[in-house]
Amino acid sequence: MTKPTSAGQADDALVRLARERFDLPDQVRRLARPPVPSLEPPYGLRVAQLTDAEMLAEWMNRPHLAAAWEYDWPASRWRQHLNAQLEGTYSLPLIGSWHGTDGGYLELYWAAKDLISHYYDADPYDLGLHAAIADLSKVNRGFGPLLLPRIVASVFANEPRCRRIMFDPDHRNTATRRLCEWAGCKFLGEHDTTNRRMALYALEAPTTAA
């Protein structure tokens, strides 16, 4: 059994991430956790820590994120969610910042280890991305089109085996769907999952001319 990350969190490593698959071929099961992408200043990305749980709980209980993510949990549940990711290899929790101020939450995950792999022909090295902006005043202000190309470029550079980055917004999330379409993602249809209807998109890695 994996040792908990910090004292007082004895049950955290036992928490299962709701979307994680375990019926995996060895090639997928053996994958290390996703690599950490990077951004040039004034923006930044870092791996989330258990000490971020209070901040994330406050963010995710804000109405715009509670509606979009349905992760409006108390800090204790966020510590469990973060610990399960940090102790595993399926998903990497990240904190985004600008000018040194934390303001975003991202999860970069192996799509073949995620429930979305039930709905398309997943490659073992496909990665998926979820992202949230904490400050409502910054939503729909151009941060998505500004930062998404930089983040995905770093993901593709850090993991050259990855040929696609997947996005699965709720089918009613028109803002994220527009961003996916603006970025050039291929639409793979709407699909009913266990608790919602998602719109599935794939962003192909850029090809290099010979």
UniProtKB/Swiss-Prot annotation:
Residues noted as binding substrate in the record, renumbered to the chain: 130
Pathway membership, UniProt: Siderophore biosynthesis; mycobactin biosynthesis
Entries under Pfam families matching the protein: Acetyltransf_8 (PF13523)
SUPFAM superfamilies assigned to the protein according to its UniProt record, in alphabetical order: Acyl-CoA N-acyltransferases (Nat)
GO molecular function, one term: N-acyltransferase activity
Source taxon at top rank: Bacteria
Identification of the protein by name: Lysine N-acyltransferase MbtK
Active site: 168 (proton acceptor)
Keywords associated with the record: Acyltransferase, Transferase
Subunit structure: Monomer.
Source organism of the structure: Mycobacterium tuberculosis (strain ATCC 25618 / H37Rv)
Intrachain S-S bonds: none
Cross-referenced PANTHER family: LYSINE N-ACYLTRANSFERASE C17G9.06C-RELATED
The UniProt record lists the keyword Acyltransferase: yes
Induction / repression: Induced by iron starvation conditions. Transcriptionally repressed by IdeR and iron.
GO biological process: catechol-containing siderophore biosynthetic process
Gene: mbtK
Organism lineage: Bacteria, Bacillati, Actinomycetota, Actinomycetes, Mycobacteriales
EC number per UniProt: 2.3.1.-
